[in-house]
């Protein structure tokens, strides 16, 4: 189809107008500079205004119009010409600023006694510098414009197969395999018309057809061929007939090359080289039936001949064989998230011991001396948020006597809270942590640049923040192996979860680590949708969350079966072995399950969720499945003993009471934290928790990183069949064929209490609300409890 000439006509019209405008504006600017031509006519007004405003820099305006006109005149304009056009505003601003700067320099030199020759030399140097700067800017615009163009188009993967389908003139590669023609299904029949392409025949060597084999298979040639027509079936002939060419007598040149034709329709080895022959000069009266040829529809992509089974050799023409796709690019190849996506904040210096810190040390000694405890300051370590004073207590003093003075020390130092560590692990001293007057910001970008020594060898490195000494704290989630995060609202829990996910996105590609995000609050993790690391879209419903965890349990058992077959103890050994022996195509990825508000799921699902989580925590470490549970309500019914026993690594943010701190860490201390990322991290290798200031990640940084990761590739979600909607198999535990196994236990609960309600059964049996309501309805149907009694519990009718 021919292109419309209208766009070209419009471009030439606008180009002519711009060219005429450039000439007129140049004359309007230059002519008033001469004595013979005054700027009194209206023609000279635009040039006069430009010159009075921008002086000689105004000559760049008609130059811009002329350049734009040339671009419109020339159809095949270059990339550098377009880059120069885009860079014009920068060149114009530079010229104007440089010229005004030169005039200011002249006025400054006018008050000095400088010779005219020196002034002229200064003017020449300034003009040359300005021209050099303009040339450098133009050169940079041309170079970086081309680089930006290449970078932008390199991010858009080209589909060469699709390009071949869209461009019928794409020449196929037929050097390795000669063209062949299908033998006729019968040696003789009525004369049939052989269709040729509508246009003139293409050059020699651009046709290829399919050759049926004896075993019901077809040979994939270098290109896919779509049969144009099917000739009528012919009767059988007992004697073999020589194959006639499928070329009409009026054809200007043969459609097939002369050598390589099959000489007989008898069964023969398809891989045997065909004997050379020549086309007969006379077409027989009864030409054998052959399949009409059609132009090649796609370029060659198959590297070698491939055999695939066919349905039936005798049922019509063979089915066209689709071209096999080229091997996909490995998703991890070149995966990298730039550091520039993160914001750079001003660096705060907090390492130095200033006079204020020394005064606090003196006040600390004075405070303890008021209670007849003579302590000695042996060290001061200043961190981004708190400063730790190391005290050496006198002999014979109980540590409990010192720790009980936390509130008195806070009052004396005018601090919001003071935490006393008695003793400091591994030291002969007591630590007193006092908040700094000015908190320093710990950024995620800073910690990415200053990694710890062993972070490169970690399987799943996670950046937490800095400790009280200012050292970066990076943990390996694969060694943790599970993590519990708890803290009150506004303590920094959500920022910690975002920093954890961001650490995975920066260090691991989608083929190395997969994420399963569960967000009952709906708004916290929704922004991570459509990234390639996700197994499923972010789950917000409790029912789908439990079904996803049940799928992970099945995946865990499948991985254990794979490890058993290769006699491996963990996923690291398995991936190493399959790589050495080339057993599998790609290693097993790690799976990280992040549940943002675990308390809401426990209320909705109850016992089933606790059982699934406990089983995953107990068994999934060896197969590379790790859990991160976050909650803001660290009560005993949410963080049960079964879950705590299987999650030894925990992070506690600021909580409201000592009891909450004991539930999380099994000790006090979290109630003394400052909030805004101040945390206590406890792992199995340490007997005392470590105080850390969490890394800060803003929402703008998250949006930029997620947008970059989304552009890398699309996610491959699990099949939606794992999220079944059948009420008979829902998470509430509906049993059709038989009674609920918990029915007898529920009857005993209501008979012992003398009252029956859905919420009471739900709390006592630790089950979901739907299942508890179904148990109450079943008791009512069997006459155990009475009908609903408004807001009061039901009456127990039978004991």
From Swiss-Prot:
Major location (coarse)? membrane
State the protein's name. DNA translocase FtsK
Cell compartments where the protein resides: Cell inner membrane
Which gene name does the record give? Answer: ftsK
Record note on domains: Consists of an N-terminal domain, which is sufficient for the localization to the septal ring and is required for cell division, followed by a linker domain, and a C-terminal domain, which forms the translocation motor involved in chromosome segregation. The C-terminal domain can be further subdivided into alpha, beta and gamma subdomains. The alpha and beta subdomains form the DNA pump, and the gamma subdomain is a regulatory subdomain.
Q: Where is this region: Disordered?
A: 167-208
The record's annotation in SUPFAM superfamilies points to: P-loop containing nucleoside triphosphate hydrolases (SSF52540), Winged helix' DNA-binding domain (SSF46785)
Stretches that traverse the bilayer: 14-34, 55-75, 85-105, 124-144
The protein's GO terms of the molecular function aspect are:
ATP binding; ATP hydrolysis activity; DNA binding
Which first-to-last residue range defines the signal peptide? Answer: none
Residues that hold ATP according to the record: 490-495
Q: Which UniProt keywords apply?
A: ATP-binding, Cell cycle, Cell division, Cell inner membrane, Cell membrane, Chromosome partition, DNA-binding, Membrane, Nucleotide-binding, Transmembrane, Transmembrane helix
The entry assigns this protein to a family as follows: Belongs to the FtsK/SpoIIIE/SftA family.
Record's function text: Essential cell division protein that coordinates cell division and chromosome segregation. The N-terminus is involved in assembly of the cell-division machinery. The C-terminus functions as a DNA motor that moves dsDNA in an ATP-dependent manner towards the dif recombination site, which is located within the replication terminus region. Required for activation of the Xer recombinase, allowing activation of chromosome unlinking by recombination.
Q: Does the keyword Acyltransferase apply?
A: no
């Amino acid at each position: 189809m021919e292109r419309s000439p209208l766009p070209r006509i419009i471009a030439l019209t606008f180009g002519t107008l711009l060219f005429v405008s450039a000439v007129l504006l140049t004359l309007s600017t230059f002519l008033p500079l001469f004595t013979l031509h005054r700027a009194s006519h209206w023609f000279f007004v635009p040039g006069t205004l430009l010159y009075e405003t921008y002086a000689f820099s105004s000559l760049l305006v008609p130059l811009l119009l002329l350049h734009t006109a040339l671009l419109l005149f020339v159809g095949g304009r270059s990339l550098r010409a377009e880059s120069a056009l885009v860079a014009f505003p920068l060149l114009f601003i530079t010229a104007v600023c440089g010229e005004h700067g030169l005039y200011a320099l002249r006025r400054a030199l006018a008050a000095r006694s400088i010779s005219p020759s020196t002034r002229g030399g200064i003017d020449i140097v300034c003009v040359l510098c300005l021209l050099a700067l303009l040339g450098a800017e133009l050169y940079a615009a041309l170079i970086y414009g081309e680089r930006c163009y290449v970078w932008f188009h390199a991010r858009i993967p080209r589909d060469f197969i699709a390009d071949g389908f869209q461009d019928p003139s794409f020449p196929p590669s037929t050097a390795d395999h000669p063209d062949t023609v299908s033998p006729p299904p019968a040696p003789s029949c009525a004369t049939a018309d052989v269709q040729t392409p509508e246009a003139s025949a293409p050059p020699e060597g651009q046709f290829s057809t399919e050759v049926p084999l004896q075993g019901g298979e077809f040979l994939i040639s270098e290109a896919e061929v779509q049969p144009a027509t099917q000739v009528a079936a012919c009767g059988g002939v007992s004697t073999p007939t020589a194959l006639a060419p499928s070329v009409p007598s009026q054809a200007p040149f043969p459609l097939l090359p002369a050598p390589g034709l099959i000489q007989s329709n008898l069964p023969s080895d398809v891989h045997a080289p065909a004997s050379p022959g020549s086309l007969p000069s006379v077409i027989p009266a009864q030409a054998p039936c052959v399949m009409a040829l059609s132009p090649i529809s796609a370029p060659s992509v198959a590297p070698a001949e491939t055999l695939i089974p066919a349905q039936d050799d005798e049922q019509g023409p063979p089915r066209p064989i689709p071209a096999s796709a080229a091997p996909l690019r490995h998703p991890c190849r070149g995966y990298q998230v730039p550091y520039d996506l993160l914001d750079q904040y001003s660096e705060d210096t907090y390492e130095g011991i200033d006079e204020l810190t020394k005064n606090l040390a003196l006040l600390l000694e004075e405070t303890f001396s008021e209670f007849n405890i003579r302590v000695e300051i042996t060290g001061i370590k200043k961190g981004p948020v708190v400063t730790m004073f190391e005290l050496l207590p006198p002999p014979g003093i109980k540590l409990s006597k010192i720790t009980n003075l936390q509130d008195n020390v806070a009052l004396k130092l005018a601090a919001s809270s003071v935490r006393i560590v008695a003793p400091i692990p591994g030291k002969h001293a007591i630590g007193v942590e006092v908040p700094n007057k000015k908190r320093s910001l710990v950024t995620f970008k800073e910690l990415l640049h200053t990694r710890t020594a062993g972070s490169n060898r970690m399987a799943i490195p996670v950046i937490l923040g800095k400790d009280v000494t200012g050292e970066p704290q990076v943990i390996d989630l694969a060694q943790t192996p599970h993590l519990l995060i708890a803290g009150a609202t506004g303590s920094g829990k959500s920022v910690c979860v975002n920093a954890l996910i961001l650490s995975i996105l920066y260090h691991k590609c989608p083929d190395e680590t997969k994420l399963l995000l569960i967000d009952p609050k709906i708004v916290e993790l929704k922004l991570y949708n459509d990234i390639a690391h996700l197994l499923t879209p972010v789950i917000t419903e409790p029912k789908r969350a439990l079904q996803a965890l049940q799928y992970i349990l099945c995946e865990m058992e499948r991985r254990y079966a794979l490890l058993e077959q290769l006699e491996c103890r963990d996923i690291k050994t398995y991936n190493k072995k399959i790589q050495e022996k080339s057993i599998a195509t790609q290693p097993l990825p790690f799976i990280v399950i992040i549940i943002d508000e675990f308390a809401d799921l426990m209320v909705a699902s109850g016992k089933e969720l606790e059982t699934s989580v406990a089983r995953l925590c107990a068994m999934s470490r060896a197969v590379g499945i790790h859990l991160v549970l976050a909650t803001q309500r660290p009560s005993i019914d949410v963080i049960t003993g079964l879950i705590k026993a299987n999650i030894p690594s925990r992070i506690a943010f600021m909580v409201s009471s000592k009891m909450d701190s004991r539930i999380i860490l099994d000790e006090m201390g979290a109630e003394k934290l400052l909030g805004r990322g101040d945390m206590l991290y406890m792992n199995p290798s340490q007997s005392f928790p470590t105080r850390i200031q969490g890394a800060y990640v803003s929402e703008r940084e998250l949006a930029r990183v997620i947008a970059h990761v989304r552009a890398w590739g699309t996610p491959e979600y699990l099949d939606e069949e794992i999220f079944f909607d059948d009420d008979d198999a829902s998470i509430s535990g509906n049993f059709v064929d038989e009674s609920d196994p918990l029915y007898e236990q529920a009857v005993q609960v209501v008979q012992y209490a003398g009252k029956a309600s859905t919420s009471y059964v739900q709390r006592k049996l630790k089950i979901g609300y739907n299942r508890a309501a179904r148990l109450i309805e079943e008791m009512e149907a069997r006459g155990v409890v009475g009908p609903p009694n408004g807001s009061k519990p039901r009456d127990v009718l039978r004991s």
